A protein has these predicted regions:
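Ordered, amphipathic secondary-structure segments that act as subunit-interaction surfaces
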Residues: 71-89
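Glycine-rich, highly charged phosphate/nucleotide-binding loops
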Residues: 57-66
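Glycine-rich, flexible N-terminal cofactor/catalytic loop recognition
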Residues: 1-56
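Class I SAM-dependent methyltransferase SAM-binding "motif I" and its flanking Rossmann-like core
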Residues: 92-125
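Short gly/pro/ser/thr-enriched loop/turn and capping motifs at secondary-structure boundaries
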Residues: 37, 84, 111-114
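Short, glycine/charged-enriched secondary-structure capping and boundary segments
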Residues: 18-21, 43-46, 66-67, 89-94, ...
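Structural motif
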Residues: 32, 53, 78-80, 105-107
Length: 125
């Protein structure tokens, strides 16, 4: 199973209980900046290593992730802040999953796009 896990934008208290459960149950964690993710893991008191997944190793790591999924491992890709695959490498992994008929899910949470829209005062109806 592949999870794309949204993470807090600035305030670590904004992490969802569902996100914590998914992170805790994951066999492997991947993130663009493992230093940011390690701060979050420390905050939620989960002792797991996080592997780097960024534009420079995206092809190699995507193959690893797909192999882990085929081996029935639970994988979570975490954003540095907000929703994965928005301004980070996750979208290419999603394309590969679609191509290989691999199921994936999003653990929703903070989104800078929605926050920006709300703070702009523009009509949303």
């Amino acid at each position: 199973m592949l999870n794309f896990v949204s993470t807090p934008i600035g305030n670590l208290n904004d992490i969802s209980l569902r996100a914590i459960d998914v992170i805790r149950s994951s066999d492997y964690l991947y993130a663009e900046d493992t230093r940011n993710t390690q701060k979050l893991l420390n905050f939620i008191k989960i002792k797991k290593k996080c592997k780097s997944f960024h534009e420079h190793n995206e092809e190699k790591i995507s193959k690893q992730i797909i192999q882990h999924i085929k081996n029935k491992k639970i994988i979570s890709v975490l954003s540095d802040a907000g929703t994965p695959a928005i301004s980070d490498p996750g979208y290419k992994l999603i394309q590969k999953c679609i191509h290989h008929n691999i199921k994936y899910t999003l653990i929703p949470g903070p989104s800078s796009v929605i926050s920006g829209l709300l703070m702009s005062g523009l009509p949303t109806n």
